[in-house]
Amino acid sequence: LRTIRAGALASLVESGHPFASLVNVAADYDGSPLLLLSRLAAHTLNLERDPRCSVLLSQGGKGDPLAHPRLTIVGSAARTEAEHVRSRFLRRHPKSELYAGFADFSFWRITVERAHLNGGFARAADFSGEAVLTPLDGAEALLAAESGAIEHMNADHREALSLYATRLLGERDGPWRATGFDPEGMDLSAGDRTARLTFDKMVATPGDLRSTLVHLATRARALAHSPAQD
């Protein structure tokens, strides 16, 4: 939900038949899928008529595609003009800024009603929307500070971001940048690659976030200098 950059959006045509299309996906603070759609596209016309939809997000990988995890989100889509939605989407998909301002494009948010997780053969389960989303109660100060925190980390702490990705998450080295903060973790990207750093405990304020990031950076540096990592 936090790391997949594109998915299959299923909307409904007038006859009631499902219509699947490939779309870029980002995540709101709570994990709700965010989309940037052209009103000229068939799926947008479908959503304007009937907001019910689903999005399939697949991790993919080598071998049998059905052996890898995938998540289906079921809900309703609605246009949104929230500035943070635009910022979050474009940090995940910076090339989309080329057309995000076109008159026929708008941002959409899917209200999650339920989810179906399939972790591979014989490993499937259904969840309520509440179960898969991040609770935001009491985190208003953190969310308000997100843009500033991201700008600060990307400008002044690129080494720490690289250490988070490579030492704590096992990712390959690259130009890692922060793209989002929420009470449960931090989203990172390096080109087309994405990663999710989950915090040890929920954070609710900028102070909580700073303390957590300092602690994680200390842990990552320790791993970087340990004999096992050399």
Protein language model features and the residues they cover:
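Short, structured beta-strand-loop surface elements
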Residues: 40-105, 111-114, 194
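An N-terminal domain-cap segment
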Residues: 1-48, 54-56
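A short beta-turn/loop motif at secondary-structure boundaries
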Residues: 15-17, 63, 180
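Coil-to-beta-strand transition motifs
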Residues: 29-33, 68-70, 192
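C-terminal edge-of-domain segments
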Residues: 98-230
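Short beta-strand segments
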Residues: 18-21, 71-73, 125, 193-197
